[in-house]
């Protein structure tokens, strides 16, 4: 009879450790979602408010650089805004994972949606990165000149918004891995 009780005690301790680890993963997932939200919304706002005007010869002739002059940068803003909206809405499910233990279906749903948002965000960030590269370096073969020597503030802001977006890409990858780890621990 004693050996049966010892097995039950050992099993219940294992369940408690597993539950504690699942709760820690859920809390970390919640925090990462908040950090990723601030990165994506910050990137969208920074890029969306980027514009610089330079006078040319006289005050009546000016050159302007705005994010919406290039479709890739507009796509970047939209992608970051969509992902930040998703991250805010997913916080409710992430909170449920902290409170409840049996959350397999919602974890699978979040993994699928996280992968979709990762694809959208990485597409937006990659397309904007190509434009930022051209703005900094130009392309001699096609006679596209680097504009960052003239539009320094514009280039600093769009480069900064890219950094925040790529940090959010890494955070989404970590969220997917954490959800997969949490699912695998249940089986």
UniProtKB/Swiss-Prot annotation:
Query: Out of the domains of life, which is the source?
Result: Eukaryota
Membrane topology listed for this record: Multi-pass membrane protein
Predominant subcellular localization, coarse grouping: membrane
One Pfam family from the UniProt entry?
CASP_dom
Provide Extracellular-side residue ranges: 46-74, 129-161
Protein location: Cell membrane
One Gene Ontology term from the biological process aspect of the record: cell wall organization
What keywords are annotated for this sequence in UniProt?
Answer: Cell membrane, Cell wall biogenesis/degradation, Glycoprotein, Membrane, Transmembrane, Transmembrane helix
Query: Looking at the UniProt record for this protein, which Gene Ontology cellular component terms does it annotate, in alphabetical order?
Result: plasma membrane
The transmembrane residues are: 25-45, 75-95, 108-128, 162-182
Where does the record say carbohydrate is attached?
A: 140
Topology feature Cytoplasmic, residues = 1-24, 96-107, 183-187
Function statement: Regulates membrane-cell wall junctions and localized cell wall deposition. Required for establishment of the Casparian strip membrane domain (CSD) and the subsequent formation of Casparian strips, a cell wall modification of the root endodermis that determines an apoplastic barrier between the intraorganismal apoplasm and the extraorganismal apoplasm and prevents lateral diffusion.
Family listed: Belongs to the Casparian strip membrane proteins (CASP) family.
Per its UniProt record, what NCBIfam families does this chain match?
A_tha_TIGR01569
* Subunit: Homodimer and heterodimers.
Please state what the protein is called.
Casparian strip membrane protein 5
Task: State the species of origin.
Answer: Arabidopsis lyrata subsp. lyrata
